A protein has these predicted regions:
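Solvent-exposed, membrane-proximal periplasmic/extracellular interface segments of envelope transport
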Residues: 40-112, 169-190, 211, 560-638, ...
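Extracytoplasmic/periplasmic membrane-proximal domains and adjacent transmembrane bundles
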Residues: 26, 71, 97, 142-319, ...
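Transmembrane helices with small-residue packing motifs
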Residues: 2-39, 91-101, 191, 225, ...
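Transmembrane alpha-helices and their membrane-interface boundaries in multi-pass membrane transporters
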Residues: 372-386, 408-427, 434-484, 593, ...
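Signature of alpha-helical transmembrane segments and their immediate interfacial
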Residues: 1-15, 407, 478-539, 927, ...
Length: 1017
């Protein structure tokens, strides 16, 4: 049944790159076209921040105010219900009075998996206007109807509108203003319900249809003049259908295109949504031959690759574990019992994953891959003991029953200690808890299932396959050879190592102080080797994508920025042979270039190596700032490697501090791409009202501001549907006021009395320096300095920045705080170190309960310092960094490496209870337990080798865990066999030494009698 349901549910599990990590965050976006950053901050951002901070559960608020847009990021306390929080935000926003022209705030709940698009679609063709129309009318509506798609944004297209360009001289002659014309257009273009009317026995609905049907209808509209009479719109304005000035340009592999970015809904399955997008585009292209498209990025491609690679590693791990079991056992039946138990256990996990609504992602499959070697541990212990009983003369039934009973306690203890360490990881807060929740559940399911199978299915299979007579004959032959079972199984070449082990064991047992000194020396040596290990939040993951960000000087036009983006693309195409496709989106003062590389298996260089090779080639491009990063999910989760937040009230002071610190940080040898969020200030035209003069003409500030906006930017008066296409009707000036400052000052403003005055009569027009963007944190102004490191050593870089801050004289009321990757790393490391302490406590109490002793767990757990330091020793040897993944591996080791000690100490205790002295019990137990210990270790280690070597694409992140686990397992096994007897003896002697120190009158028992007493709590 387990196999049937496992296969069935395995095919039903959804796939994803990462677990569904819904962070307690939200973003509030508000658009106010034409407003400066200062206006956005004062009129939009500040009121919204005040309202947000009054909502329960809000932890912190940060905002960015830029031209026409306010963006506020909200961080909630953990376990906040985002839907309820969003509802409360809307209630607060409804009570606000934002300025006319500001759009309603849009609230978007955040999810880490939503930070990257689900799909990128490039519509190719010669006519951008036609491509835009195709995108708006056909493609986008079809994609937005897909279940799970949140939005589809369009970049690079050209839209059309009906432009009403007012002639200021002719309009003034009739006493008309742009505002008056806009209001008239709105009033004349409507469909107005009128109610019902009786027509005989029928009731008919009445509506007044005055909608414009064409551009000519708009041009021929009759305007009633304020002074009496009328005039047609075409007599005072040029009315035409035209393409709008494009805000963005997009290009794909050297061709102009319209680029669509598909984002999924929070909680929707990314792989499923991207597959639906791919199928929908294929069906659209089949139905409409005018659709020519490319898919430069599809999330499902990478997800499928990651999942298939992980599954291949799981299968390879199972095969390697089975081979090791066969090499040790040399019995087909015994090997089959082990081999069958592994897939049965994995299929059982698939059933539980479906019940708990987990997905097949890198973390859940990583848990299975890391646990494949562990699931045979219990089976090997039970199997080996059953065969030992059979070799000693027990019949098949008693060998299976009694052999299983003898090791049941140690199997349960080792299983519970292994599972216990995952509880604090899964329950830890922050990113660590969200990231490893699926991992802990799957590996916990796997290990608990392995215990059940080892104590039930394995004895059953042994009973079916065991031939006790053959086992007994094999044992006699081995006895005649006078060789240990391990030697006869693996080969004579290990005989010398085995006898060396026996000599060392005998020496350390009789020289306990030397044994303890050697153990302590190993810890000191390993720790010393690890002191230079770098620390990072997460290891990088090669997704085969490189992101190049271009910033051009203030005031740059789209064409100027596009020319630089073209040059960057050309350099990339010439110097990156691994390039599969390239696309970019260019705006007025910035551009984003994306490089898509070939599959990892088809190239020799990583995406980081490619990015490093491009950096010097692109730094020579003048007139812009360029930053290069390899795009991956872990980078988005980690934040910037260099991130410094400076807060205070005065923006000029913040700018000065940021300039000083940016220069000093940029001078650091390891720092690259260091930029400040203020950069250069933008020259801006400021119109300051003369309220007394304006009042004389009956003008308010709102009327003057609207007149300036209508003249320079224009306003959308209404919309007209022509050929099923909705077009905005935009009323604007003839552009004469935009030619110079003097022209702006001379712009006519309609007065309340029907006359006109120049703008300079009611306002002062001057050029000022203003910030391009204004950032705030918790309602205080903030400037951020960000950058990257060449080496990836965030810890060393942070130390250097702290040294700079220590020597910097910060003005009173201003603070500088390190954030980004380092802050997140410290928080996650703290959570995991706390989880490690809790895990050690759980392991101790589980062992104390199992062995009914307080000292026995101490003996078993004394192996952990050597195991931990030995595990970390492998990181600098393999060029790896200490990351959150490595720390989780250490926590896993806390519950794994003690298993060998449990088996060893439990058997020593059993032999002492049979009357043997301590030394005899140790020297008899260790050789007898070396085979199952070596078998379990080698199966666990070899099963992790594919993951540690990152065999297949996308597995770099889990590779660190495999390396740490393998190193810890190998070193801990060697140390367990040599030093656990030493630890046991030292702890066993403590009561006697304690009694001597207290000078008690109670006579000590004879040495041989004392040695025969096992350690008790």
């Amino acid at each position: 049944m387990v196999v049937i349901f496992g296969v069935m549910y395995a095919t039903q599990l959804q796939m994803a790159l990462m677990p569904d990590m819904e962070m307690p965050m939200a973003v509030v976006m508000t658009t106010y076209v034409g407003a400066t950053p200062s206006d956005i901050e004062e009129l939009v951002t500040r009121p919204l921040e005040t309202a947000i901070m009054s909502v329960p559960g809000v932890d912190s608020v940060s905002s960015t105010s830029s031209d026409g847009v306010s963006q506020i990021q909200i961080t909630y306390v953990e376990d906040t219900n985002l839907d309820i929080a969003a509802s409360k935000l809307r209630e607060k926003f409804d009570m606000l009075s934002l300025p006319d022209g500001a759009m309603d705030p849009i609230i978007v709940n955040m999810n880490i998996s939503d930070l990257m698009p689900t799909a990128m679609i490039a519509l190719m063709g010669d006519d951008l206007a036609e491509l835009q129309e195709l995108a708006e009318d056909v493609v986008v509506p079809a994609l937005e109807r897909i279940d799970g798609v949140a939005s589809v944004s369009i970049n690079g297209g050209v839209t059309e509108q009906i432009t009403v360009e007012v002639d200021p001289t002719r309009a003034a002659g009739f006493g008309l203003s742009n505002s008056y014309i806009s209001q008239f257009l709105t009033a004349e273009n409507l469909l107005y319900p009128g109610g019902d009317v009786q027509n005989g026995s029928k009731t008919l609905t009445v509506s007044t249809d005055a909608k414009f049907q064409s551009v000519e209808d708009v041009a021929n509209m009759i305007i009633s003049l304020p002074t009496g009479g009328s005039v047609r719109l075409r007599e005072v304005a040029d009315v035409r259908l035209e393409a709008t000035e494009s805000d963005t340009l997009a290009m794909m592999n050297g061709e102009d295109c319209v680029l669509l970015q598909v984002s999924k809904q929070s909680g929707a399955n990314e792989e499923e949504v991207s597959n639906k997008v791919e199928k929908r585009m294929a069906s659209l292209a089949a139905e409409n031959r005018s659709i020519n498209y490319a898919l430069p990025y599809l999330a499902s491609d990478f997800i499928d690759l990651a999942v298939s690679s992980a599954l291949q590693n799981i299968i390879l791990g199972v095969v390697l574990a089975a081979i090791v079991a066969f090499l040790f056992l040399r019995r087909f039946g015994a090997t089959m019992a082990i081999a069958v138990s592994m897939p049965v256990c994995i299929l059982a996990v698939f059933v539980l994953m479906n019940i708990f609504d987990l997905t097949l992602n890198m973390m859940s499959l990583g848990g299975i891959a890391m646990g494949v070697g562990m699931i045979v541990d219990n089976s090997i212990v039970v199997l080996e003991n059953i065969y030992r009983f059979a070799a000693e003369g027990h019949d098949r039934m008693s060998a299976c029953v009694d052999g299983t009973k003898e090791v049941t306690t140690s199997v349960i203890a080792s299983t519970l200690t292994t599972v216990a360490v995952f509880i604090p990881i899964g329950l830890s807060g922050g990113m660590a808890g969200m990231l490893f929740d699926d991992f802990c559940l799957t590996i916990g399911f796997l290990i608990l299932g392995s215990m059940a199978i080892a104590l039930t299915l394995v004895p059953l299979l042994c009973y079916m396959m065991l031939d006790e007579n053959k086992v007994r004959q094999d044992q006699i032959k081995k006895a005649e050879k006078k060789q240990n079972a391990l030697v006869s199984t693996v080969g004579g070449w290990i005989s010398k190592l085995y006898h060396l082990y026996l000599r060392l064991l005998d020496y350390f047992v009789h020289h306990l102080k030397i044994g303890m000194l050697v153990a302590v020396g190993l810890v000191v040596f390993f720790v010393g080797c690890c002191l230079t290990t770098n620390m990072v939040l997460l290891p990088s993951m090669d997704m085969g994508q490189i992101s190049i960000s271009i910033s051009t000087p203030i005031g740059s036009q789209v064409d100027e920025t596009t020319a630089i983006a073209d040059r960057v693309a050309a350099i990339a195409q010439e110097n990156v042979p691994e390039l599969e496709s390239i696309y970019y989106v260019s705006e007025a003062e910035s551009a984003s270039v994306a490089l898509i590389l070939t599959d990892k298996s088809d190239r020799d260089r990583s995406s980081d190596d490619v990015a490093d090779s491009l950096r010097p080639l692109l730094q020579d491009i003048a007139g812009c700032e360029i930053t290069i990063t390899s795009s991956d999910m872990t980078a988005l989760m980690s934040g910037d490697e260099i991130s410094l937040d400076i807060t205070g009230d005065d923006y000029e002071t913040l700018t000065m501090i940021a300039a000083d610190l940016t220069g000093q940080i940029s001078a650091l040898e390891d720092a690259v791409d260091v930029t400040s969020s203020v950069a250069d200030q933008v020259p801006q035209v400021k119109v300051t009202m003369n309220r007394e003069a304006a009042a004389q003409y009956g003008l308010t500030a709102a009327q003057v501001g609207a007149a300036v906006r209508d003249e320079l930017t224009g306003s959308t008066a209404t919309s007209v549907t022509i050929n099923n296409k909705e077009l905005d009707v935009v009323v604007k000036g003839d552009g004469s006021a935009t030619e110079s400052l003097d022209a702006l000052r001379s712009m006519s403003v309609a007065t309340a009395m029907g006359g006109y005055v120049p703008l300079s009569s009611v306002a002062n027009v001057e050029v000022v320096q203003a910030p391009q963007t204004i950032t705030r944190s918790n309602q205080s102004r903030q400037v951020s300095i960000t950058g990257s490191t060449l080496s990836g050593d965030v810890t060393a870089m942070t130390a250097s920045i702290n040294a700079i801050l220590d020597n910097y004289s910060m003005p009173e009321g201003y603070t500088a705080t390190i954030s980004g990757s380092y802050e997140e790393m410290m928080e996650s490391f703290t959570d995991l170190l706390l989880a490690l302490v809790v895990a050690l406590g759980l392991v101790y109490f589980v062992l104390a309960a199992q062995f009914e002793s307080f000292l026995m767990p101490v003996i078993i757990m004394m192996i952990l310092p050597v195991a931990f330091s030995g595990a970390l020793f492998a990181l600098p040897l393999t060029g790896r960094d200490l990351s959150m993944i490595s720390l989780v591996a250490l926590i896993m080791l806390a519950g794994t490496v003690v298993n060998n000690s449990i088996v060893l100490v439990d058997y020593i205790k059993t032999r002492r209870e049979m009357g043997e002295s301590r030394e005899d019990a140790i020297l008899h137990a260790c050789p007898l337990r070396i085979r199952p210990i070596m078998m379990t270790t080698l199966t666990t280690v070899l099963a992790m080798v594919p993951m540690a070597m990152a065999m297949g694409d996308t597995l770099e992140m889990m590779s660190d865990m495999g390396i740490t686990m393998i190193s810890g397992m190998i070193i801990s096994t060697i140390v367990t066999l040599l030093f656990t007897p030493v630890f046991y003896s030292v702890i066993d002697d403590l009561p006697r030494h304690f009694r001597r120190r207290k000078h008690t009158d109670t006579p000590e028992p004879p040495a041989d009698e004392a040695a025969a007493l096992p350690v008790e709590g």
